[in-house]
Amino acid sequence: MNLIEKGKTDFEFEDERGLICQISHGDIAQVNYVFSKKGAVRGKFHYHKRAKEQFYVISGKLKLEVFKGDTREEYVFTTGNVFLIPPLVRHNFIYLEDTLLVSTYDRCVETGENEKDIFND
């Protein structure tokens, strides 16, 4: 059973000028740019009740730990990888190198004043 979905970019175009990479299209409510230093840990096995997250690794390397119920999984992602974490899947990031990534959400995790779709219970 895979708790997450490994994805790919919608398209990539590269020529002598550089690269265009379409990470996602459609309904995106929130976009985050994240830089984490080697050895950093983020997430603390939080989860979202409603939001679905998609990540694109711009550069670097990270280990993703996920669990739901009795199922636990680990993945390593590097530059160019895309992955999606569905609602209710707990997740934690361990950065194996300095890493840049973009995360998109299908709905905002900040749902109102002092309200968030981020849980650690």
Language-model regions, residue ranges each:
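Double-stranded beta-helix
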Residues: 2-5, 10-15, 94-121
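A short, N-terminal "cap"/entry segment at the start of jelly-roll beta-barrel domains
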Residues: 1-30, 37
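Short beta-strand His + acidic residue motifs that chelate non-heme Fe in jelly-roll/DSBH
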Residues: 20, 44, 64-65, 85, ...
